[in-house]
Amino acid sequence: MYLKRILITLSLITLPIVPCLSYAAESISNVGINNTGSTANLAPAAADANVSASDKHEESWWQRSKNNLSTTWNAPQSHDIYIPTITWHNRWTYDKEKTDRYNEKPWGAGYGVSRLDKDGDWHGLYIMAFKDSYNKWEPIGGYGYEKRWRPTSDQDFQLGLGFTAGFTMRDNWNYIPIPVLLPLASISYSKLSFQATYIPGTYNNGNVFFAWFRWQI
């Protein structure tokens, strides 16, 4: 019940922002949802396809951000399951006595929606909860973006680099919502992605590698 309450609290903080942005997409025609088995075949959102080069040039960064959030929320191409996999505390920045007692198995799960835009880049909204360094539940939710590269002839194999922005809540901070802006990287093949971030910090604080699997359903 405690975990359920904090997840509900986090969703109330992060998710209502997105529907408020939906007005940005009201003039856009309905976007079909393509749920094909391969990420290489995911059809880019019609909203993106209808934006001319001149319109895109005139569009502000803030407006583009709102449009991306709104389109991802209203017209996702896939629904995703998140499985936290590893947290690793950088041994160069921690005393051994601390890392010896920290938890590095972030048991948990999450859910999200995502899409590829007309350039083949990834946009996602997600919420997940996992066991933190002190083995306490930590929820996190937000928006993720990755520029995608397809270095081989197999278009299902993709590399990604971008960022995630959202909110998290921790037991040792009394579950006060804390904004986060972190780097994001991934290796993907078809429906499966291995995504990771690095939380910077100071000595004995932060400097944590956190990774998870994302599976399109």
Curated annotation (Swiss-Prot):
GO cellular component, one term: cell outer membrane
Site residues (Role in the phospholipid gating), renumbered to this chain: 203
Residues at the active site: 89, 132, 133
GO BP: lipid A biosynthetic process
Site, as annotated: Role in lipopolysaccharide recognition: 98
Keywords recorded for this protein, A-Z: Acyltransferase, Cell outer membrane, Membrane, Signal, Transferase
Residues spanning the signal sequence: 1-24
Enzyme Commission number(s) from the entry: 2.3.1.251
Main location: membrane
A Pfam family of this chain: PagP
Location(s), subcellular: Cell outer membrane
Catalytic activity: a lipid A + a 1,2-diacyl-sn-glycero-3-phosphocholine = a hepta-acyl lipid A + a 2-acyl-sn-glycero-3-phosphocholine; a lipid IVA + a 1,2-diacyl-sn-glycero-3-phosphocholine = a lipid IVB + a 2-acyl-sn-glycero-3-phosphocholine; a lipid IIA + a 1,2-diacyl-sn-glycero-3-phosphocholine = a lipid IIB + a 2-acyl-sn-glycero-3-phosphocholine
GO molecular function: acyltransferase activity
Known function: Transfers a fatty acid residue from the sn-1 position of a phospholipid to the N-linked hydroxyfatty acid chain on the proximal unit of lipid A or its precursors.
Subunit comment: Homodimer.
Family affiliation: Belongs to the lipid A palmitoyltransferase family.
Protein name, entry field: Lipid A acyltransferase PagP
Species annotation: Pectobacterium atrosepticum (strain SCRI 1043 / ATCC BAA-672)
Organism classification: Bacteria, Pseudomonadati, Pseudomonadota, Gammaproteobacteria, Enterobacterales
